[in-house]
């Protein structure tokens, strides 16, 4: 296995790690319901993307309610 020939100095180590940083996700506001959502993603509250309804949230809510009734 390959090994480094010399130890990395503190300054070189810092320069190496300078580009290793986390970026915050791009959060925007949904134009339909004004809830926060990730950009380029459908809204998880109202199910719209780019002005169109792509997820039927009423059907999902009904399915969830039926499932919870069956467990009780």
UniProtKB/Swiss-Prot annotation:
Record keywords: Ribonucleoprotein, Ribosomal protein
GO BP term, pick one: translation
UniProt keyword Amino-acid biosynthesis present: no
Covalent S-S links between cysteines: none
Top-level taxonomic group: Bacteria
GO terms of molecular function: structural constituent of ribosome
UniProt keyword Ribosomal protein present: yes
InterPro entries tied to this protein: Ribosomal_bL32 (IPR002677), Ribosomal_bL32_bact (IPR044957), Ribosomal_zn-bd (IPR011332)
Gene Ontology, cellular component aspect: large ribosomal subunit
Family: Belongs to the bacterial ribosomal protein bL32 family.
Name the record gives this protein: Large ribosomal subunit protein bL32
Gene encoding the protein: rpmF
């Amino acid at each position: 296995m390959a090994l480094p020939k010399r130890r990395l100095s503190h300054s070189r180590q810092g320069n190496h790690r300078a580009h290793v940083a986390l970026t915050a996700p791009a959060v925007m506001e949904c134009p339909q319901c004004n809830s926060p959502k990730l950009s380029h993603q459908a809204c998880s509250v109202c199910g719209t993307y780019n002005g169109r309804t792509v997820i039927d949230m009423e059907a999902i809510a009904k399915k969830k309610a039926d499932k919870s009734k069956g467990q009780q």
